[in-house]
């Protein structure tokens, strides 16, 4: 949820991590 400190591959296009998750 909080991509502010959780740089995971969420469904939030907030950074490269988000993009990577979408591709996967």
UniProtKB/Swiss-Prot annotation:
Transit peptide in keyword set: no
Keyword tags: Metalloenzyme inhibitor, Metalloprotease inhibitor, Protease inhibitor, Secreted
A molecular function (GO) term: peptidase inhibitor activity
Comp. bias (Basic residues): 1-13
Biased composition (Gly residues): 14-24
Chain intervals for the UniProt region annotation (Disordered): 1-24
Subcellular location: Secreted
GO CC terms, sorted: extracellular region
Organ and tissue specificity: Expressed by the venom gland.
Family, as annotated: Belongs to the pHpG family.
Known role: May serve as a metalloproteinase inhibitor during glandular storage. Their inhibition may be instantly disengaged, by dilution or physiochemical change, when venom is injected into tissue of the victim.
UniProt-recorded name of the protein: Poly-His-poly-Gly peptide 1
Species of origin: Atheris squamigera (Variable bush viper)
Origin organism lineage: Eukaryota, Metazoa, Chordata, Craniata, Vertebrata
